[in-house]
């Protein structure tokens, strides 16, 4: 009888735990995806902060010339970064237990893999958590669908691109100047500005900003007055009110006359779907462009495509871009310290201590 009661208590404890995990009454919803999201994001954040502040230099190029990225090794907030794993590691999985010592793991940039893989796992679980909460509240799943765009972009630069290039050392450094370094080198090696998917992505991001500004300004300009002239118009809105807070007919009429009639939405639902769709599709296409260039399916190359009747090249803008690409690629050449974002530190370590004896 006692054993039966213990089994019931155990089941009851598990049921209470499940109920707490999936409860929508908690201040912050946890969910089953949150069970994995919370530890992975906490791990990624903790290791990132520690590495950004105190990690020793990393042999990113695999040429025994470590590059310093942490604050304690001479960087500031702008130049600091978590340096990607060494080219000597390639795309091998490199957890702490695969290294001979902690010093070796740090020297080869192990923290970068740890941060990136935990971060990508965490944000993927965040997508699932958004879907899970929407499902339990009876909402549609579009919030989680929209968040797949930035997650796809992060996965492209942190995971897909290193896999395509054959080494995590080609991944984007976790820092401000490291991000710019990555962008310049990416342009030099892949001509991303001439990739149609990236161009569509730029249209998506800038277009989304424009549409957001247009929508916000139109709504703010056509608010239904519920307050006196001496009060802020914002006080005229009560959270949860059923009435419209702005006059969509006035906004539609204004914008239709400003541009032309069919440039303006007359359906609030389709308008907001469009506002969500435009930047999301743009960022999807940008992530797809990086993922294709990871395997060297690069941007268009129109270099020296215009010649005169004598066969002489007439330089076009494409040739100017090509010259800039060559300059950036040369400046980033391995073991040539003329690129200001590469902060080299420490003496080069000899690979062979003695020269081999050659007989004959």
Swiss-Prot record:
Q: Which residues bind chlorophyll a PD1?
A: 198
Q: What is one term from the GO cellular component aspect held by the record? A: photosystem II
Which Gene Ontology molecular function entries are recorded, alphabetically? chlorophyll binding; electron transporter, transferring electrons within the cyclic electron transport pathway of photosynthesis activity; iron ion binding; oxidoreductase activity, acting on diphenols and related substances as donors, oxygen as acceptor
Binding locations of Fe cation: 215, 272
Q: Where is this site: Tyrosine radical intermediate?
A: 161
Q: What's an example Gene Ontology biological process for this entry?
A: photosynthetic electron transport in photosystem II
Any further remarks? 2 of the reaction center chlorophylls (ChlD1 and ChlD2) are entirely coordinated by water. Herbicides such as atrazine, BNT, diuron or ioxynil bind in the Q(B) binding site and block subsequent electron transfer.
Q: Which PROSITE patterns match?
A: REACTION_CENTER (PS00244)
Question: What is the protein's species of origin?
Answer: Pyropia yezoensis
Pfam families assigned: Photo_RC (PF00124)
Q: Where is this site: Cleavage?
A: 344-345
Q: Write down the membrane topology.
A: Multi-pass membrane protein
The UniProt entry, under SUPFAM superfamilies, shows: Bacterial photosystem II reaction centre, L and M subunits
- What name is this protein filed under? Photosystem II protein D1
Site residues by UniProt (Stabilizes free radical intermediate):
190
| Propeptide regions on this chain | 345-360
Which terms are listed as keywords in the entry?
Answer: Calcium, Chlorophyll, Chloroplast, Chromophore, Electron transport, Herbicide resistance, Iron, Magnesium, Manganese, Membrane, Metal-binding, Oxidoreductase, Photosynthesis, Photosystem II, Plastid, Thylakoid, Transmembrane, Transmembrane helix, Transport
- What is the protein's known function? Photosystem II (PSII) is a light-driven water:plastoquinone oxidoreductase that uses light energy to abstract electrons from H(2)O, generating O(2) and a proton gradient subsequently used for ATP formation. It consists of a core antenna complex that captures photons, and an electron transfer chain that converts photonic excitation into a charge separation. The D1/D2 (PsbA/PsbD) reaction center heterodimer binds P680, the primary electron donor of PSII as well as several subsequent electron acceptors.
């Amino acid at each position: 009888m006692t054993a039966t009661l213990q089994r019931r208590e155990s089941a009851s404890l598990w049921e209470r735990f499940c109920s707490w995990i999936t409860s929508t009454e908690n201040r912050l919803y946890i969910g089953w995806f949150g069970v994995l999201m919370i530890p992975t994001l906490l791990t990624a954040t903790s290791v990132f902060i520690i590495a950004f502040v105190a990690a020793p230099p990393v042999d990113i190029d695999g040429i025994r010339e470590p590059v310093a990225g942490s604050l304690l090794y001479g960087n500031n907030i702008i130049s600091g970064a978590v340096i990607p794993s060494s080219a000597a590691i390639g795309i091998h999985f490199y957890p702490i237990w695969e290294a001979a010592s902690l010093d070796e793991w740090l020297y080869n940039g192990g923290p970068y893999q740890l941060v990136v893989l935990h971060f990508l796992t965490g944000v993927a679980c965040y997508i699932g958590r958004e879907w899970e909460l929407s499902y339990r509240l009876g909402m549609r799943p579009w919030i989680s669908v929209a968040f797949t765009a930035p997650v796809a972009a992060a996965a492209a630069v942190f995971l897909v691109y290193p896999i395509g290039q054959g080494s995590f050392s080609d991944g984007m450094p976790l820092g401000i100047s490291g991000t710019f370094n990555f962008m310049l080198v990416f342009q030099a090696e892949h001509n991303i500005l001439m990739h149609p998917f990236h161009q569509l992505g730029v249209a998506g991001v800038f277009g989304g900003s424009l549409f957001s500004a247009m929508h916000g300004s139109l709504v703010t300009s056509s608010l239904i007055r519920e307050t006196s002239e001496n009060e802020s118009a914002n006080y005229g809105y009560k959270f949860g009110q059923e009435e419209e807070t702005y006059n969509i007919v006035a906004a539609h009429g204004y914008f239709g006359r400003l541009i032309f009639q069919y440039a303006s939405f007359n359906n609030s639902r389709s308008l907001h779907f469009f506002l969500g769709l435009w930047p999301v599709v743009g960022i999807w296409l940008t992530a797809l462009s990086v993922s294709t260039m990871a395997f060297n399916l690069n941007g268009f190359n129109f270099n020296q495509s215009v010649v005169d009747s004598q066969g002489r090249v007439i330089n076009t803008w494409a040739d100017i871009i090509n010259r800039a690409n060559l300059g950036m690629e040369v400046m980033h050449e391995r073991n040539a310290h003329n690129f200001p974002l590469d902060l080299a530190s420490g003496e080069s370590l000899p690979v062979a201590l003695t020269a081999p004896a050659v007989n004959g």
